[in-house]
């Protein structure tokens, strides 16, 4: 519907109240009279300027503390940091010397750790040099003495390294050469570190106390000035803004009660004056609106009947939608319960597959250990067979030697027999020789008997060796067959493991799919429940619409009565 002239007047006044006014008079007083925003900005600007001057004064008092703090950071604090860094690097240097002694037996390792030692030494010298550059007076002399002491310590360590190398990389010799030489340097560095930290802490405490005093004084001054500015601003705002606004509120309250008889008097040219002009325009606009409402009430009465019929049709459709949605939600809940059962069974199957896979893995490990044991036993059997065969060969050689000895014994026996015959022919002259020949023959017979017994024992040993070799060879063939069977069993276990792994993956996929299906079903069920709830809510709203449409006719009548109460 096009805007009425009264409506356009209200909009123009409201825009004029929001847009800054560009005054034609260039004087500052005219600008302040025509712009409430300028008055507020002047008030706020003056307040902020006063607070800014006070803050600048406080900031100026803090500048000296900031400068002192910067000097602290560049002087004592920096010196304390450098001495801490030098102390840390010196400990690293001592540690690298221990690495040279303990791990430098090989040339490559000794060179590596000695290079690291020299790098740590250079780092300490560099840090002490930087500390000397920032130090002054007695502190600088002490730093130079410490640096010179550290150089002498490096010379002593190099002499100790030379003794270490001359002693064939003996760590005891190297350690004895440098025992206690780092104590003086360590003590000087620790003393200097404690003094620097103490000086830094004292200086920092002094600066902090001064800064706290300055901040406290500045805060008190700033708070007092802020209270004074706030009270002055409150008085000015109450006189120039609050009281005129209260008068406007009273006039608008009369408009809200339907009293359009009086117009507000306008004496100001700023935004509040424009707001008063807009209130008068609003009063004219409302009078026109109430005339239009009287005409619209009649049209509203006729439209309420049509709305009631449409609401009845919507109520029937909503009840049918609610019934169908409830049935689908019940089916989705049943499907979700079924999917949860499938996921649980798939999870149980996956856990069972995991247990079977673990058992198969343990069985495979046992099989592999058995195969290794059989292989080692087969090697031992091969070695035993070789030893037995060597024993058989040695027994054969011994038998040959015994055959030679037996032949010699038989020849000796024949010679002794011939000697006895010759001694008997010689009579008394050969009696002594006959006794000796008889003894020789007796010894030859005993030798032959012993050789026969030894030969019998060797035959027994050879037979036993042959039987043992055959038995071991038979056991070896059986162990090879057993090893092959164990290997086949291991292969089958690996196949079982792979199959169980595949089953486990499939069970997990099934469980995942079932869980996803459950989640989707639950989401659908929730959505259906929400749809059912929305349908129920829509049904209630449609029923309310039906009731509202029935009451709409009565309300239009009441509206007509209310319009009669307005006083133009």
Curated annotation (Swiss-Prot):
Induction: Constitutively expressed.
Periplasmic-facing ranges: 61-216
Assigned keywords, A-Z: Cell inner membrane, Cell membrane, Chemotaxis, Membrane, Methylation, Transducer, Transmembrane, Transmembrane helix
Pfam families, per database record: HAMP, MCPsignal
HAMP domain mapped to chain residues: 239-291
Domain Methyl-accepting transducer: 296-532
Bilayer disposition of the protein: Multi-pass membrane protein
Transmembrane segments: 40-60, 217-237
InterPro entries: Chemotax_Me-accpt_rcpt, HAMP_dom, MCPsignal_dom
Subcellular location as annotated: Cell inner membrane
GO cellular component term of the entry, any: plasma membrane
Coiled coil: none
GO MF annotation terms: transmembrane signaling receptor activity
Cited Gene3D superfamilies: HAMP domain in histidine kinase, Methyl-accepting chemotaxis protein
Cytoplasmic side: 1-39, 238-568
GO biological process: chemotaxis; detection of phosphate ion; signal transduction
Domain remarks in the Swiss-Prot or TrEMBL record: Binding to inorganic phosphate induces dimerization and stabilization of the ligand binding domain.
PANTHER family from the UniProt entry: METHYL-ACCEPTING CHEMOTAXIS PROTEIN MCPB (PTHR32089), METHYL-ACCEPTING CHEMOTAXIS PROTEIN TLPQ (PTHR32089:SF120)
Function per UniProt: Chemotactic-signal transducers respond to changes in the concentration of attractants and repellents in the environment, transduce a signal from the outside to the inside of the cell, and facilitate sensory adaptation through the variation of the level of methylation. Chemoreceptor for inorganic phosphate, which is required for taxis at high concentrations of phosphate. Recognizes inorganic phosphate directly. Can also bind to other components that have a pyrophosphate group, including ATP and ADP.
Family (UniProt): Belongs to the methyl-accepting chemotaxis (MCP) protein family.
Protein name: Methyl-accepting chemotaxis protein CtpH
Organism listed in the record: Pseudomonas aeruginosa (strain ATCC 15692 / DSM 22644 / CIP 104116 / JCM 14847 / LMG 12228 / 1C / PRS 101 / PAO1)
Gene it is expressed from: ctpH
């Amino acid at each position: 519907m096009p805007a009425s002239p009264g409506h356009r007047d209200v909009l123009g006044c409201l825009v004029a109240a929001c847009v800054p006014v560009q005054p034609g008079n260039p004087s500052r007083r005219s600008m302040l009279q025509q712009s409430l925003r300028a008055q507020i900005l002047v008030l706020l600007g003056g307040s902020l300027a006063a607070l800014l001057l006070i803050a600048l004064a406080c900031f100026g008092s803090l500048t000296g503390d900031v400068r002192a703090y910067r000097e602290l950071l560049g002087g004592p604090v920096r010196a304390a940091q450098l001495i801490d860094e030098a102390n840390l690097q010196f400990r690293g240097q001592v540690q690298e010397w221990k690495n040279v002694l303990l791990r430098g037996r090989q040339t490559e390792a000794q060179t590596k750790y000695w290079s690291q030692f020299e790098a740590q030494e250079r780092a300490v010298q560099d840090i002490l040099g930087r500390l000397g550059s920032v130090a002054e007076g007695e502190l600088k002399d002490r730093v130079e003495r410490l640096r010179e002491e550290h150089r002498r310590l490096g010379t002593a360590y190099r002499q100790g390294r030379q003794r270490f190398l001359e002693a064939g990389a003996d760590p005891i010799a190297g350690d004895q050469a440098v025992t206690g030489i780092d104590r003086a340097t360590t003590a000087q560095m620790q003393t200097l570190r404690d003094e620097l930290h103490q000086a830094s802490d004292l200086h920092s405490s002094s600066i902090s106390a001064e800064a706290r005093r300055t901040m406290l004084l500045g805060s008190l001054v700033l708070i007092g000035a802020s209270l004074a500015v706030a009270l002055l601003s409150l008085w000015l705002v109450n006189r120039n803004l609050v009281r005129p606004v209260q008068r406007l509120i009273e006039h608008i309250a009369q408009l809200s009660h339907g009293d359009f008889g009086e117009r507000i008097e306008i004496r100001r040219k700023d935004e509040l004056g424009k707001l008063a002009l807009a209130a008068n325009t609003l009063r004219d606009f409302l009078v026109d609106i109430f005339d239009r409402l009287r005409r619209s009430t009649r049209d509203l009465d006729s439209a309420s009947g049509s709305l009631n019929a449409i609401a009845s049709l919507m109520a029937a459709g909503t009840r049918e939608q609610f019934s169908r949605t409830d049935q689908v939600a019940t089916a989705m809940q049943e499907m979700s319960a079924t999917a949860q059962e499938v996921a649980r069974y798939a999870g149980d199957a996956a856990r069972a597959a995991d247990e079977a896979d673990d058992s198969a893995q343990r069985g495979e490990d046992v099989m592999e250990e058995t195969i290794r044991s059989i292989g080692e036993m087969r090697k031992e059997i091969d070695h035993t067979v070789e030893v037995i065969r060597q024993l058989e060969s040695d027994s054969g050689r011994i038998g040959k030697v015994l055959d030679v000895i037996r032949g010699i014994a038989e020849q000796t026996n024949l010679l002794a027999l011939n000697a006895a015959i010759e001694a008997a022919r010689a009579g008394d002259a050969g009696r002594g020789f006959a006794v000796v020949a008889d003894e020789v023959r007796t010894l030859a017979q005993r030798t032959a008997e012993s050789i026969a017994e030894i030969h019998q024992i060797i035959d027994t040993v050879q037979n036993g060796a042959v039987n043992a070799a055959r038995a071991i060879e038979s056991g070896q063939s059986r162990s090879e067959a057993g090893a092959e069977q164990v290997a086949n069993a291991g292969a089958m276990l690996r196949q079982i493991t792979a199959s169980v792994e595949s089953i486990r993956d499939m069970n997990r996929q099934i469980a995942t799919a079932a869980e996803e299906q459950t989640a989707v079903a639950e989401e659908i069920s929730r959505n259906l429940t929400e749809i059912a709830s929305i349908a129920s809510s829509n049904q209630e709203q449609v029923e309310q619409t039906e009731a509202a449409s029935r009451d709409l006719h009565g309300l239009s009548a009441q509206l007509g009565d209310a319009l009669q109460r307005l006083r133009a």
